Amino acid sequence: MNAKTDFSGYEVGYDIPALPGMDESEIQTPCLILDLDALERNIRKMGDYAKAHGMRHRSHGKMHKSVDVQKLQESLGGSVGVCCQKVSEAEAFARGGIKDVLVTNEVREPAKIDRLARLPKTGATVTVCVDDVQNIADLSAAAQKHGTELGIFVEIDCGAGRCGVTTKEAVVEIAKAAAAAPNLTFKGIQAYQGRDAAHGQLRGPQGQAGRRHCPGERGRGRAGGRGLAPEFVSGGGTGSYYFESNSGIYNELQCGSYAFMDADYGRIHDAEGKRIDQGEWENALFILTSVMSHAKPHLAVVDAGLKAQSVDSGLPFVYGRDDVKYIKCSDEHGVVEDKDGVLKVNDKLRLVPGHCDPTCNVHDWYVGVRNGKVETVWPVSARGKGY
């Protein structure tokens, strides 16, 4: 699904949380809202940064799962394409008109490989990560079957302990196999540090996270020395892009959360000790929630609980206020400490979620707000696309 302009037949509250032209106070809750001004500033800022540092930026769609947000990242921020984690995510973006798709994950099940090999028929350029020679053979066979071409990134484990090879020899072996396989092209190296790479680190030249880049450097050097110079060394998330872009190794970034921000990223500080969500980036994503009960004088209950957010990275914080605090939640309820009794039933609060990616995945819509008015409503196009 792409951005809608015709909402005839949609019932507010049942089908959709709001319609363009409504006041923010009229939005049905709990739902996701986007501060469009902040979102656009974040997108432009990352695009300007990448350009100034001679880097390509491929925005990570697993964060927002939205064709419309991705198109905004391409038009305003110069994103060259989208990263996805699942074949079904890639299908949603390709079918939605995104022309360059990188699956930053391994695809091994035969049925999924077959779906991936068909995807270039949508007109999209499709690339996938590999960490095993047998996977090369399987991808090549499927691409030949469908008469398509697939790009290959060899994935290096940069310390996350997940997918990816750990030796230079393995990089060369897989790159050689990809270069020789029919209907496949060896394009480069995937070396992504992950969300936690810079947590607890200073974001400046004195930070230590940059030391993790040596696997990407070794992999590029060894492959290039065998006549298999990678076109791209890709990686670098919101928590570590500073290091990749100044490493002299990478030429493509894969940032995602920068566009929305969340409470967990707010724990990262820049070289001056400031939170990166209060200066470097802006909070653009919020869970809008309403007070539904204030039976206890010091506690307000809101309608955003576990089913409206992910708390794997901590509880949300109440945006723009230090007089109230979100302190706990259950399935359908959130409890807000209100020591001074300032909240009233039906008051609305903006919550900054602890972790944006899985929070977005439990909602159907983004409500885009500017100056207190609903300007647009976008579907979460790849919501639930985990297969």
From Swiss-Prot:
SMART domains: D-ser_dehydrat. Residues 199-228 are annotated as: Disordered. Divalent metal cation. Can use Mn(2+), Mg(2+) or Co(2+). Catalyzes the condensation of glyoxylate and glycine into (2R,3S)-beta-hydroxyaspartate ((3S)-3-hydroxy-D-aspartate). Functions in glyoxylate assimilation via the beta-hydroxyaspartate cycle (BHAC). In vitro catalyzes the cleavage of both D-erythro- and D-threo-3-hydroxyaspartate to glycine and glyoxylate. Also acts on D-threonine, D-3-phenylserine and D-3-3,4-methylenedioxyphenylserine. It is an enzyme of class 4 (lyase). This is 3-hydroxy-D-aspartate aldolase. Its cofactor is pyridoxal 5'-phosphate; Mn(2+); Mg(2+); Co(2+). Optimum temperature is 35 degrees Celsius. The gene is dhaa. Gene3D superfamilies: Alanine racemase, D-serine dehydratase-like domain. The keyword Signal does not apply. GO terms for biological process: D-serine catabolic process. InterPro entries: Ala_racemase_N (IPR001608), D-amino_acid_metab_enzyme (IPR051466), D-ser_dehydrat-like_dom (IPR026956), D-ser_dehydrat-like_sf (IPR042208), HdxyAspAldBhcC (IPR054854), PLP-binding_barrel (IPR029066). It comes from the Bacteria. It comes from Paracoccus denitrificans. One of its GO terms (molecular function) is D-serine ammonia-lyase activity. The keyword Lyase applies. It catalyses: (3S)-3-hydroxy-D-aspartate = glyoxylate + glycine; (3R)-3-hydroxy-D-aspartate = glyoxylate + glycine. The modification N6-(pyridoxal phosphate)lysine is found at K62. Its EC number is 4.1.3.41.
